[in-house]
Amino acid sequence: MTRDLRLVPVAVGTWAVALACVLWPVLTGFAAIGSWCAAGAALACAFVTRRGALTAVACAAAAIAASSVWFALPARDAAADALDGRVTAVVVTVTTKVEPTIGGVRFSGSAQIDGATARVSVRLTGGEAPDGLDLGARVSVTGGGEPTDPGESAAVIVFARSAEVVRRPPHVFGLASALRHGFVDEVIRGLPDPGGGLLPGLSVGETSAVSDELDAQMKASSLSHLTAVSGSNCSLVVGLAYGACALCGLGRRTRIVVATAVLAGFVVLVTPEASVIRAAAMSAIGMFALLLGRRGAGIAVLALAVTVLVIADPWISTSFGFLLSASATGALLLLAEPLARGLGRWMPRALALGIAVPLSAQLVCGPIIVLFAPEVALYGVVANMIAGPGAPLATVLGLVACLAQPVPPLALGAAALAWLPSAWIAQTAETFAALPAARLGWSQGWLGFTLLTLVGAACVIVACRLRPRWLRRVATTALAVLVGTGTGMVTLSGVAGPLTAPRDWSIALCDVGQGDAILLRSAGHTAIVDTGPDVRALETCLSRLGVDDIDVAFLTHFDADHVTGVPALAGRAHTIIHGPASEPGELAD
């Protein structure tokens, strides 16, 4: 099968230029002018030689992305200067999900500052969010501002202790907010956890009911993409809408219009996360191609969607969520079929395809994940094979329950049915997270990225029997050594390790590198003082000592070598007591 990869260099080049411009703003002018000059030269050559038109398109796309950053910088700088270190009132139009934090909420939006529109991130502390604070609302916040680092989507962070909703979400935003909150507060109330807590995320993107313990289990089993609505849900909803219109005998144009409208409503309902935006752009481009009577190749549609989104918002190029979403989609489009053919030599076709889909995503996304979380979910492929089929059922039935709220019996019945696959996914996560060495430690940073990329390449070479033969032999040998070494390490750390730990300890000092993590145990109760800077090291220490339940955690102060390991306490610590924050951002984050 041939694939049209011509637009891939365009997307990669545009992404690279946008990323460089937002991380190093001083380069923006040079990048914009240079890209425009290159585009002009390539276009002139194309007219003369009838070749190189794609090069001109790639240079023009990069030039537009760089120019977009260039034109946005003055407003961002003005907003940062106006709010830096000052306590002032800012009216913000909410453009993202409102997420809970310790002692408050956080959200982002656009604001008029000194006559210019800039993106602002708000950390609201000191109480619950005011009623009506949701996507599309306009809220007045009072607090101190702090400029962000280059590459951050927002130009400035406002640390606020008070907020007033001056306009509730209007029109379709208000309807979506009412449906979303009604679903969480009324429809699924009473459904047993953890399935009941996971269902809102699978259906409408509302993750507030997901416990820390379940969140940690989903990450450990490589199922975190099922915690909330992902890009695949967009494709599912659009496909169902288009198919329903076809069954009703509607024409192609009507089907496309209805499917596109349903897509827009779904994005508003679940709030525009990075993976949802990517999938929505791909679906919209696919609908447009269908309207023109053309079939869009999957990888070409992905490349075009990435290019358009990066041009529209160059700061999305720094989003790990967007990178993971695009990478996973590309892996499914490029690797799943060859892997399925290769695995099909040893197993039935259906089983080979079932393994190839999560394996391809894991091979591509794994190296990216170790850049910020140096660990590998050892059972991720198997967990996804088992839990994956439940996600579409939970999504569709959950959406039916959400939209059927005016008819309570129907809504409650659909929610009860949706709970079954949701509970199945949660139970799968719990089971695999509890297995020995569920998260295998890996090298951090670019070294870990390179090593895991080589491992993934070796897997593809062996499974797909790529030539030449000597390359397959090298890859096979490398994988055999890796599997043997990994098995030995898992045996030593997962089985022999806990046997060497003392059982009657009262005070234990975890080896977390620079910093402290001190465990205290008395009368059946356990406490920890500080967490150190290394999440993985603390998790290893807690697992080795058999500490699954911590009554109280004390954080003496907010230096990185004392609190960076806090995520290791997720699902373990019941209470956290901390010292005073020297800066407002420490407590807000």
Residue ranges and their predicted role:
Residues 2, 89, 115, 125-142, ...:
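Non-globular, low-confidence helical/coil segments that flank catalytic cores
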Residues 93-181:
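OB-fold single-stranded nucleic acid-binding module
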Residues 1-78, 278:
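N-terminal leader/targeting segments
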Residues 211-381, 444-499, 580:
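Hydrophobic alpha-helical transmembrane segments in multi-pass membrane proteins
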Residues 331-437:
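Alpha-helical transmembrane segments of multi-pass integral membrane proteins
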Residues 2-8, 12-19, 151-279, 287, ...:
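Aromatic-rich juxtamembrane segments at the membrane interface
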Residues 69-87, 494-499:
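Short boundary/loop segments of OB/S1/cold-shock single-stranded nucleic-acid-binding domains
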